[in-house]
Design a protein with these regions (language model features):
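Positively charged n-region of N-terminal signal peptides that target proteins for export
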Residues: 1-6
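Sec-dependent signal peptide cleavage junction
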Residues: 21-32
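Extracellular, repeat-based ectodomains that mediate carbohydrate processing or recognition
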Residues: 31-429
Length: 460
């Protein structure tokens, strides 16, 4: 009750100060700079937030309504500069830091079902964010599933490079099927020649692809996919020279198709990474042998599958559970796998907890009510550590590695936390920004709320 009263008082004071600061703006202090608030606590198929190691620190990239925010931080995660890149098309796809610059993927709907209409644009920038090329992707009616009505539909937007080509995997909705009154959803992979910036669709289907990830290693591309239509989580290997494809089943789903409509999978596909000799994939699932008896008490568990590159087969693939819940309808708010080096990976997750059962957050850190779980495995998926926990949420941001630290950020509308985990011993630290507006910060200590900065407040 005391905590509730403190937070209620805090909100009341925020509202009062918002009115005061609008009427009586203060003068900005020299050198003051405030990060941009962006709620990224929900883990999405299409990431809206990225963090990239750069010389001297980190670059934060995040999607806003019609633009992309870019902020630079030093190695101590102190903000140094910020800018905005206007989007060229209305649909956000994703961001990728390539070997030859930065890429933004954007799109637009094709409701007129015009085969020659641009539906996806892959825009390249140099490392100073000067635009220096773009590839236009159109439908390819010669391929099954190559007709695009809505790009990115119920899909990720993930990218990798191989042999001078950029590959993008995502989902899409095809042209309307008159027999059902809507288009079917499926997998889509596009290839962009980085020298000419010419792009095309190279693989696609209409088999209800609900998550897609891609990595490259040697002469192969590895694609992890949640294929509801195939009733399994599947892993495909493409020869990057010929695009010949071999696919194996990692996790079969229960149920069977009796119509064109999607069936529940009771599973998620959350990420993949490659070591020097194996492909590691993470996801969650119920016990699929109990599919027909699923209830609100049926738990999900976190699993890790490992497929050796030298024997790319279902028989050689091993799968093990990383959690062992048996009831209470346990589920997950998000799962990530982060490559530290070829023989060390961090798997992190947050278990779903109802608002009624969450622990109280501190008044000075609204994000501290969540619990992040993480552990380390080697390149063959064997455990290297115990399971660690820290007061932090999972977020939309994929963790990155710099100077033996795994770093990511989480943010709501008024707090931005950078979390840093020592990749050797698992110790976690954080740096917090309290954001009260574009040029204002807040702090709550000893029952006193302090607002610093100038201009209007933005409080949610």
């Amino acid at each position: 009750m005391k905590k509730l009263k403190e937070l209620t008082s805090l909100l009341f004071l925020f509202c009062c100060l918002c009115f005061c600061l609008i009427l009586f703006p203060q003068t900005a202090r020299a050198g003051s700079l405030t990060p941009t608030a962006q709620d990224n606590l929900k883990v999405r198929l299409r990431r809206t937030s990225d963090l990239i190691p750069v010389s001297g620190g980190y670059m934060r990239v995040f999607h806003q309504k019609n633009s992309v925010g870019v902020e630079y931080y030093d190695n101590d995660l102190k903000i140094r500069s910020k800018r905005k890149i206007n989007m060229e098309l209305p649909l956000w796809g994703g961001f990728y830091a390539g070997s030859d610059g930065y890429y933004l993927v954007e799109g637009q709907t094709n409701n007129k079902e015009n085969d020659s209409a641009e539906v996806i644009r892959v825009i390249r920038y140099d490392t100073n964010w000067n635009r220096n090329g773009a590839a236009a992707i159109t439908s390819n009616p010669e391929l099954f599933g190559g007709e695009i009505r809505t790009p990115f539909d119920y899909g990720c937007v993930e990218m990798t490079e191989s042999n001078g080509k950029l590959y993008v995997v995502t989902g899409h909705e095809g042209y309307v099927d008159s027999s059902v009154g809507q288009g079917h959803q499926g997998f889509l992979m596009a290839e962009i020649d980085q020298a000419t910036m010419k792009g095309k669709i190279v693989s696609c289907d209409l088999w209800h692809s609900f998550a897609q990830y891609i990595k490259s290693h040697g002469s192969y591309l590895y694609v992890l996919e949640q294929s509801e239509g195939s009733r399994c989580t599947k892993l495909s290997r493409y020869d990057s020279n010929t695009l010949d494809c071999t696919t194996i089943e990692l996790l079969p789903y229960g149920g069977s198709h009796t119509s064109v409509w999607a069936l529940a999978c009771y599973a998620s596909v959350d990420g993949m990474a490659v070591s020097s000799d194996s492909v590691l994939c993470v996801g969650t699932s119920i016990d699929q042998s109990k599919y027909d008896k699923v209830s609100e008490n049926t738990p999900h568990n976190l699993y890790l599958s490992v497929t050796p590159m030298s024997d790319f087969s279902e028989k050689a693939t091993t799968t093990r559970k990383l959690t062992n819940f048996t009831g209470e309808g346990k589920s997950f708010a998000g799962v990530k796998i982060t490559k530290i080096n070829d023989n060390r990976f961090m798997i992190s997750w947050e278990e779903y907890v109802s608002d009624d059962n969450k622990k109280n957050s501190s008044a000075n850190d609204p994000l501290s009510s969540s619990t992040l779980h993480y552990l380390f495995v080697d390149g063959k998926g064997k455990s290297l550590s115990k399971e660690f926990t820290t007061a932090a949420p999972i977020s939309d941001c994929q963790p990155v590695v710099k100077d033996s630290r795994v770093v990511y950020y989480a943010s709501n509308s008024n707090t931005l936390n950078f979390y840093s985990i020592n990749s050797d011993n698992g110790k976690a630290d954080k740096k917090t920004y309290h954001i009260a507006g574009d040029n204002a910060t807040w702090n709550f200590k000893n029952g006193i709320l302090t607002i610093s900065g100038y201009g209007p407040l933005s409080i949610s």
